[in-house]
Amino acid sequence: MQVGNILINAISDGTFIARPTYFGDHAAAGHYDLFDRHGQAWLPIGCFLVRSGTRCVLVDAGMGPSRMWDGDDEPCRLVGGQLPVALRALGVHRDDVTDVVCTHLHPDHVGWLFDLDSRPNFPHATIWFGQGDWRYFIDRDDPLIQEHIHHGFRGHAGDAHLRPIDRDTSVAPGITAIQAPGHTPGHLCVVVASDGQRALLLGDAITCPVQLDEPAWHSMGDVDPGLADRTRERLWRELEGDDVTGTGAHFPELKFGRVLGGSGKRWWT
């Protein structure tokens, strides 16, 4: 995806398998554009490499070399591991990454930040994330976060390369992290803008395009469902613009799209 002078490469670190129960009590498996005949949605674990001038910005760091696979009947299962290979295929070495923006600190977005010895996987990168997520996940020792990731954050607390933010912040030329709370307290989205064009990288603020038609569908991980609803609606409206396109970390095939509206109906295209 080219946005003016900025190049965005979509990368899948692995697979996120969701059942209807992941989206709450209102979800049904009848959405055959999302669920297969076994009632499972096969979604990517998305990351995005954004190159702007001399800056090489990774948005989200995947699941890492780990998995969440407690049983076939669980609402969701995740397995990662592909990000390093994908970066190499794009000609990018881990030393080349100048910034990592974590839309939030769920395990499928931070998994490659630190190696299993809690050392930074991207040694020259500034890591940006929401201050509210630090308080919620790291200060509280949330068991959802992988142990080596916890230790990595805590061991480098106060380091200049860890940048918690609590307001909209410019990360690099044409790349801005904006506040989008609800899914998690400090959830961020990323706006890429160049030459009058914009792209929104939504993280998990919107899990999949079906939620445009099914506003009652939540994500199992929403910390504040009411606030997550309001944030989703704000982002849907933002995506109605002629100059903007967007995608989320779990959108099928990580395809970019926009919202078309008319006659009281909205479509994702």
What are these regions (language model features)?
Residues 2, 78-92, 96-108, 123-179, ...:
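Metallo-beta-lactamase
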Residues 13-14, 61-64, 105, 132-133, ...:
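Active-site metal-binding loops of divalent metal-dependent hydrolases
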Residues 110-120, 258-259:
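Metal-dependent catalytic neighborhoods of phosphoester/phosphodiester hydrolases
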Residues 76-81, 85, 195-269:
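Cap/insert and terminal regions of metallo-dependent hydrolase folds
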